[in-house]
Amino acid sequence: QVAEPLHISKKTIYTVYPSKEALLLDMVDHAFAEIHHCKQEILAGSGTLQEKLRAVIIAMPTEYAALDLRQMKELDEKYPVVAARVRSQLENGWEPTMALLEQAVAEGVMRPVSLPVLRQMITASIESFLADRSLAESGVQYVAVLEEMISILLEGVLPR
């Protein structure tokens, strides 16, 4: 799946990577590096604190917007080390986001809540979306899922 869009042979890829697992690990690391870069751009950019909160929590570079939600299940089955790396990446690198959340509470943009609980809710939601095939099978795009999640978490479900 990687060789064809790059117009190179599988043999060429395997001269650089000793296995498909090594290739996938590198791809995961690259994807999350891009996500962290995207978050840094959001934090450094203009916009209200509320806009930054919404954007940074669900940051997703354009090239990953079409992410297939069914991939995590396949990784768990075929490449558990890669699946573990994805989970580890989801759980790490939260410092800038946590600082933004703390700022939002301090400035009254967000009511005081347990930030570790909120972080766990976000991480668990993302992991659940990646593991459950039902949303992808019903045609829902991953970015739309993230946008709905953050809307519910930040705005709640009760009418205002």
Region spans (language model):
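Secondary-structure edge/capping motif, primarily at the C-terminal ends of alpha-helices
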Residues: 42, 71-75, 129, 133-136
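All-alpha amphipathic helical-bundle segments outside canonical DNA-binding/catalytic cores
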Residues: 50-51, 85-89, 105-123, 140-148
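C-terminal peripheral helix-coil segments that are non-catalytic and often amphipathic
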Residues: 55, 62, 95, 99-107, ...
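Helix-turn-helix
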Residues: 1-22, 26
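Hydrophobic alpha-helical connector segments
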Residues: 26, 30, 37-66, 118-122
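Short secondary-structure transition hinges
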Residues: 61-99, 105, 109
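Amphipathic, non-transmembrane alpha-helical scaffold segments
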Residues: 24, 28, 32, 83-94, ...
